[in-house]
Amino acid sequence: MEMSVLKLWDYWALISIIFIGIPHGAFDGAISITLGYSKKLKLQLAFISMYIFIAFVVIMFWIYFPVIALILFLFLSVFHFGLGDLVWKNSKFYLLKGYFHGGLFVFGIIFLNTSEVDIIFKILSGENLSLLWHALDTGAFIWIISCFLILFFQKSIVLTKQYIGLICIILSIIILLPPLPAFALYFCLIHSWNHVSRIYPTLISYMKKRKAILLMIGFSTTSWIMGLIGYYFILETDGFSNSILKITFIGIASLTVPHMILVDGFFRPKFKI
């Protein structure tokens, strides 16, 4: 049963997320080659199989434990967005600053648009969201503590004019725009751009530009096809708008976990970018 009707700008936001935002993660195939995981056909097949397996596990976990899955996804997003906009550093302040930065966006969108976001969360994870909101309140409290810690250690944590400008842009986005357009604008134009502009020079130093682009297109197309198949299966029971929301965000969650493992766990620490 359909719970809500999305507005026109929400549909444009979802289309942008699917066709502009998701392809930034499709460079993971090229990243695996750069890391040496796909030098041989056996390694390529093993990497792709493991990537798909992890994504499948995330989807199944979401089906059986939707509220816990959403909680984990949101907190993973805090760190992934936060760290993704920062230059990698082997520092105890790196995770702290990442939590602050990512939390500003994630918690900002949520707590500035609680009624709209609650509807989206109910579509994604059902009606009983008390545990989710308790976790978010706790996460926001920890975020406030991170703000004070950053102010306390401000001599150790350098806040450049460029970074302060980025914070102002993010604040403008989450204050002025509805939640889905705000997420789309940040995800497509800030997070995706920072990711691609950081990794691309390293990728093309290990392979031809054409190969990196073709791998990205291949991974993107595969993701879109799988999403379309999933959309077809849930359309009858969930309705048009709800199906798009579910496929978009559960799909992003399923891709974020292997993407984070590869990028934040191996690629960026190795190349220090």
Segments (PLM) and residue ranges:
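Cytoplasmic-side transmembrane-helix entry/capping segments in multi-pass membrane proteins
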Residues: 37-45, 71, 91-104, 158-166, ...
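Hydrophobic, membrane-inserted alpha-helices
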Residues: 1, 49-59, 81-83, 146-148, ...
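Membrane-interface helix-loop-helix junctions at boundaries between adjacent transmembrane segments
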Residues: 56-131
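Hydrophobic core segments of alpha-helical transmembrane domains in multi-pass membrane proteins
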Residues: 13-21, 67-79, 182-194, 248-252
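C-terminal ends of transmembrane helices
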Residues: 25-35, 78-91, 147-158, 195-203, ...
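N-terminal signal-anchor module of multipass membrane proteins
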Residues: 1-30, 249-255, 265
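Membrane-interface helix termini and inter-helical loops of multi-pass transporters
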Residues: 2-4, 117-132, 234-242
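Alpha-helical transmembrane segments of multi-pass integral membrane proteins
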Residues: 20, 97-117, 134-153, 165-179, ...
